[in-house]
Amino acid sequence: MKKIGLFLLLGFSLSWLVSACQERQQERRKEVPLDSIVLSDPCILADRKTAMYYMTGTGGMLWKSKDLKLWEGPFHVAKTDSGSWMGPKPMIWAAELHPYKGKYYYFATFTNQAVKIDTVQGNVIERRASHVLVSDNPDGPYVPMKDSTYLPADKPTLDGTFWVDKDGKPYMVYCYEWLQALDGTIEKIELKPDLSGTIGEGKLLFRASESPWSREKDADGKDKPNKVTDGPYLFRTGTGRLGMIWTSWIYNVYTQGVAYSESGTLDGPWIQEKDPITPPDFGHGMLFQTLDGKWLMSVHRHKDVNGRYIRIPRLFEVDFSGDKLMVGKLYIP
């Protein structure tokens, strides 16, 4: 149990190091192959207005490409308010780009390491929350909107994503972090019509422990479901089913699964598929359609290279034209 907790905390340290290194790396490069970019939580927007691909993730940077093969970047696109709760230099994790009603929105996790909100089982918890920035252009700059907070200040949240449900209302779907929750959750909260803030309170969708495939050891060395929820992303199949990919761990192996809503709405109930959806050490996925109409899944590969954990973007072919999401072979642009 202690080893698993240490491993997970090292994973958070890795995210911080990736974020810090990317923020320091200001030199812009051209014609960089996708597999030469070190990036956690890659999210790709295929923008038809500009006929370009825009990739973001952890670190607050953005990359551009015309063909998915060669990329230019990194560009610093997130312009936060130093006077806000985020502080002057927040860590930025798992950024996503979402076009909506003529604008582009930057959903990301921001952490102010100078502010401590809780201590649980010896773990000091920093001020961390999902938040939304806005821009008129896909390559930014992305700036704050009206509301200074989207989620409670005393609750660590992360990996917010965007979904418009059957009621026509926009929602943020996010993780309540296991460090405080102990059994991490995925929740939803309604957004204002212009996404400038939230309405009401968050609602539980499911808990990490509901997963039939994730695993960790308890204090007695016995197997139990893992406590981590990470990287939710929503989609609708060709038959109208609402699905969600999300990531956890099988012991020390980063693993992605999928759940489906029986009601076809965010309210669920959510039924977890028995087996993971992608191979071991691939996770934090999202789905996008290429400019020529092909559906792909963007993930990062989590691997150990001589004791250093490296995360690199990878693409998989996918098909969800039927009743379920089917993940095919690796796609090489």
PLM-predicted stretches and their roles:
Residues 21-333:
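Carbohydrate-active catalytic/glycan-binding domains of CAZyme proteins
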Residues 1-27:
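Bacterial Sec-dependent N-terminal signal peptides
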